[in-house]
Amino acid sequence: MLSKQIPLGIYEKALPAGECWLERLRLAKTLGFDFVEMSVDETDERLSRLDWSREQRLALVNAIVETGVRVPSMCLSAHRRFPLGSEDDAVRAQGLEIMRKAIQFAQDVGIRVIQLAGYDVYYQEANNETRRRFRDGLKESVEMASRAQVTLAMEIMDYPLMNSISKALGYAHYLNNPWFQLYPDIGNLSAWDNDVQMELQAGIGHIVAVHVKDTKPGVFKNVPFGEGVVDFERCFETLKQSGYCGPYLIEMWSETAEDPAAEVVKARDWVKARMAKAGTVEAA
């Protein structure tokens, strides 16, 4: 039976590091989460997941079935290292191959949404050519995703090219494809000079999930909840009033903390209290 509750998930990098997904999903369940978002970042270790064997993929599926904790989304940040906008043809080809493998992986294990990093390039200088190549790369990527019935969703970034929902909507209109949508990060959105509530309202109808974290201007990671600039309650209220009923994902990087689970519990309670005030979830 489908739950009527708003799904609340936790980012893989918030939990203890390791490759045993059964342990990770059991812990997430113990901590009260509905799902875990997988990370495929630019490290060789996490990139190697895209080359998992059939048995390794089945082990993940079996862990999901056994625990009842889903893995419905993937944060694909590997394109920092292999950007779709790269002027180096070999690097760009690697970026497209990573996209192909990620879409195939998602199709195999039941991941519905791949969150994309909105960088034309990250470690190089951007220009009109890198942006053109990025657009063309997205077009190729969405064609692959369409055939696999996997949604690609653009994150709102810590980078000027994609630092607002309005900018991401421009790409959605350009691609004009139901398999390309938006996955805003209310922390990143709030760290720039955006009218955050108007931006959230503008994205309704295209938002498939929401990242939840705190930020400060120029500081996009590891800001403790409540110490940054994000008006969480208003963001949750705006999304609820606009009709958004999809998942929220607490994004943290506590996997190397002395006690990751304790850090996650503290963040979970803080976020759920703000969601309850906004009427997004029932008060504890």
UniProtKB/Swiss-Prot annotation:
Enzyme Commission number: 5.1.3.22
GO molecular function, one term: L-ribulose-5-phosphate 3-epimerase activity
Listed GO biological process terms: L-ascorbic acid catabolic process
Reaction equations catalysed: L-ribulose 5-phosphate = L-xylulose 5-phosphate
Keywords for the protein's UniProt record, in alphabetical order: Isomerase
The keyword Nucleus is assigned to this record: no
Induction: Induced by L-ascorbate. Repressed by UlaR.
Pathway connected to this protein: Cofactor degradation; L-ascorbate degradation; D-xylulose 5-phosphate from L-ascorbate: step 3/4
Cysteine-cysteine disulfides: none
Entries under InterPro entries matching the protein: L-Ru-5P_3-Epase, L-Ru-5P_3-Epase_Enterobacteria, Sugar_Epim/Isomerase, Xyl_isomerase-like_sf, Xyl_isomerase-like_TIM-brl
Function: Catalyzes the isomerization of L-xylulose-5-phosphate to L-ribulose-5-phosphate. Is involved in the anaerobic L-ascorbate utilization.
Stored PANTHER family: ISOMERASE, L-RIBULOSE-5-PHOSPHATE 3-EPIMERASE ULAE
Recorded family membership: Belongs to the L-ribulose-5-phosphate 3-epimerase family.
Record-given protein name: L-ribulose-5-phosphate 3-epimerase UlaE
Taxonomic lineage from the root: Bacteria, Pseudomonadati, Pseudomonadota, Gammaproteobacteria, Enterobacterales
Gene it is expressed from: ulaE
